[in-house]
Design a protein with these regions (language model features):
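The conserved Walker
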Residues: 42
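Conserved substrate/cofactor phosphate-moiety recognition/catalytic segment
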Residues: 51-116, 120
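Conserved lysine of the Walker
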Residues: 46
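Conserved catalytic network of the ASCE P-loop NTPase/AAA+ motor domain
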Residues: 116-123, 142-147, 188-191
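Small-molecule kinase domains that catalyze NTP-dependent phosphoryl transfer to phosphate-bearing small molecules
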Residues: 155-211, 219-227
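Loop/turn-to-beta-strand initiation segments
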Residues: 63, 121-125, 150
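Extreme N-terminal, non-catalytic leader segments
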Residues: 1-35
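Conserved phosphate-donor/acceptor-positioning beta-strand/loop module used by diverse small-molecule
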Residues: 126-132, 144-164, 198
């Protein structure tokens, strides 16, 4: 531990209560804050579905935001190679996140912490991450109140995901160019108790998004639409 780190460890870091609390923010928004955690293989349709749900929530006047797995890798959870060009090798090695099991664990932990803050702000936070390991998803669930975590398993056969392959990643993994790729040479652990399971190859994104919205209505996250 460096000298600066030792000083930092001695600082009394306390949680500061907000002047405007969560209940007030949720009352203003007209809905509850929560985390909708979309998980599934690469190419299963997580980002597409999360953005479609976000679009429909926004159309109804609700406060929502998508945290996308690719987007956060450009900043908060940037890789060592990306950070090195901006901050140097030492910084990149210390703070950059790769794609091994431990780095993936930290990637999900950080996103869980950000999503929890969004929830306290009364925002419906939609996260789209492969998040292949069950223990990591459950760790995020435990960060939140019991009803604040909604796990959505975006289920699609591996063959379907490979046929989509929008980034060409499966092709590279099959060729041995990518190691530890989920679904090929690293496991994806299916959820055991997902609140919602979506079979993404069976319907269009708007229809699939409607399934999520109906669940949110029944759970009291958002108001039910008047008939």
């Amino acid at each position: 531990i460096g000298e600066q780190d030792q000083v930092t460890e001695l600082v009394d870091v306390r949680w500061h209560a907000a002047t405007v609390d969560r209940d007030q923010r949720e009352t203003s928004a007209g809905h509850r804050g929560c985390v909708i955690w979309f998980t599934g293989l690469s190419g299963s349709g997580k980002s597409t579905l999360a953005n479609e749900v976000d679009k429909q929530l926004h159309a109804r006047g609700y406060r929502s935001f998508v945290l996308d797995g690719d987007n956060v890798r450009h900043g908060l959870n940037a890789s060592p190679s990306l950070l090195e060009s901006m901050h140097g090798e030492a910084f990149a090695k210390r703070f950059g996140l790769g794609f091994g099991p431990e780095a993936r664990k930290e990637n999900i932990r950080r996103i869980g912490a950000v999503a929890e803050l969004f929830t306290q702000a009364g925002i419906i936070t939609l996260t789209a991450f492969i998040s292949p390991y069950r223990r990591d998803r459950e760790a995020v669930r435990k960060m939140l109140s019991e009803t604040d975590f909604v796990e959505v398993y975006v289920k699609a056969p591996l063959a379907v995901c490979e046929s989509r392959d929008p980034k060409g990643l499966y092709k590279k993994a099959r060729a041995g160019e990518i190691k530890g790729f989920t679904g090929i040479n690293d496991p994806y652990e299916e959820p055991e108790k997902a609140e919602i399971t979506i079979e993404s190859e069976k319907n269009s994104p708007p229809v699939l998004a409607e399934q999520v919205l109906v669940w949110l209505e029944r759970a009291g996250v958002i108001p039910s639409r008047k008939k």
